[in-house]
Amino acid sequence: MREGAPRGARLRMIDLQGAFLAPPEYDLVCVLCDSYVELAETEIAEHCAAVRPALPDAPDAETFARRFDLLTLTRKGKDHARFLYAARERGDERFLAYAPTTVRQLKRAAARASVRDARLADLAALIHELPESPCAR
């Protein structure tokens, strides 16, 4: 509770992604799998369970989990590539501090996704080999 906030007021999480049109789970991935603030897996699961029934199509738990993990792979893969590009091509290493969190999120999502769909096993194996520190190899 913030000082001066009205009694009973609760803090809320909001996501300001701009005008990007994406599946509703994408916003959850952006908020819950942020590279700058690493949430515990249990906290992520609790938020997902609370929001899932309120999504436009109210997907069943398995459909939601599949979408969430595939979107996590897409989003975190993009983040990881941007961090490495900034460091290697522009000499801007500020974002490398967030690569370990991003790689951990990629590895968890890839492992879960490959259990659901064997066609993702090779991708999961490649992601599993990513070093948390981009300078490790």
Language-model-detected regions and their locations in the chain:
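Active-site activation/catalytic loop segments of kinase-like enzymes and analogous catalytic loops
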Residues: 21-58, 70-90, 102-109
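ATP/Mg2+ or Mg2+-diphosphate-binding catalytic cores
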Residues: 81-137
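Pre-DFG segment of protein kinase catalytic domains
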Residues: 12-15
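Activation-loop N-terminal segment of eukaryotic-like protein kinases
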Residues: 2-8
